[in-house]
Amino acid sequence: MVRLLGIDPGLRFTGWGLVDVDGNRLCHVADGVIATDGDAPVPERLRCLHDSLLDLVRRYGPREAAVEETYVNRNGASTLKLGYARGVALLVPALAGIAVSEYGAMAVKRAVVGTGAASKDQVEMMVRRLLPGATIRRADASDALAVAICHAHHRASALRVSAGTRMA
């Protein structure tokens, strides 16, 4: 069994979700949202995000992590700030020795729903279906669980390819 941490980074709200994977079985462990004070200076918000993610890594001990890639919007300042949060989300697990993968939003939607054009509601519905018993309170947490599920699917495919290569 492998524990995966999915992260949907944001400077105001960062979603996180933990999933245990055993073969093709997924089991919800925990999820939530890290909220930073929107009135605080950016460095303080990044420190809050760092400390909270570090606490999650220490508390739950994931073996692998996956982070959603940043989309670029028209507001360059917002995109840059999102990039700061994403950097923290990539760095914390990496410093803990955890392998980190990255997935774009369309890849996550395709892995969870079957189409890269899925709506947020469709993604959340499938996350709830794939992880029965998960009590998801915010869309950010649902997105993070979707990132973890996406990584589980990609990981399983890579393991099958690797096993096939060894047998040949």
From Swiss-Prot:
EC numbers, comma separated: 3.1.21.10
Binding site for Mg(2+) 1: D8, D140
Catalytic residues as annotated in Swiss-Prot or TrEMBL: D8, E68, D140
Top EC class, one word: hydrolase
Catalytic reaction annotation: Endonucleolytic cleavage at a junction such as a reciprocal single-stranded crossover between two homologous DNA duplexes (Holliday junction)
Binding positions (Mg(2+) 2): E68
Cofactor note: Binds 2 Mg(2+) ion per subunit.
GO CC entries: cytoplasm; Holliday junction resolvase complex
UniProt keyword list: Cytoplasm, DNA damage, DNA recombination, DNA repair, DNA-binding, Endonuclease, Hydrolase, Magnesium, Metal-binding, Nuclease
Entries under PROSITE patterns matching the protein: RUVC
Cofactor(s) of this protein: Mg(2+)
HAMAP family (UniProt xref): RuvC (MF_00034)
Function of the protein: The RuvA-RuvB-RuvC complex processes Holliday junction (HJ) DNA during genetic recombination and DNA repair. Endonuclease that resolves HJ intermediates. Cleaves cruciform DNA by making single-stranded nicks across the HJ at symmetrical positions within the homologous arms, yielding a 5'-phosphate and a 3'-hydroxyl group; requires a central core of homology in the junction. The consensus cleavage sequence is 5'-(A/T)TT(C/G)-3'. Cleavage occurs on the 3'-side of the TT dinucleotide at the point of strand exchange.
Protein name: Crossover junction endodeoxyribonuclease RuvC
Organism: Gluconacetobacter diazotrophicus (strain ATCC 49037 / DSM 5601 / CCUG 37298 / CIP 103539 / LMG 7603 / PAl5)
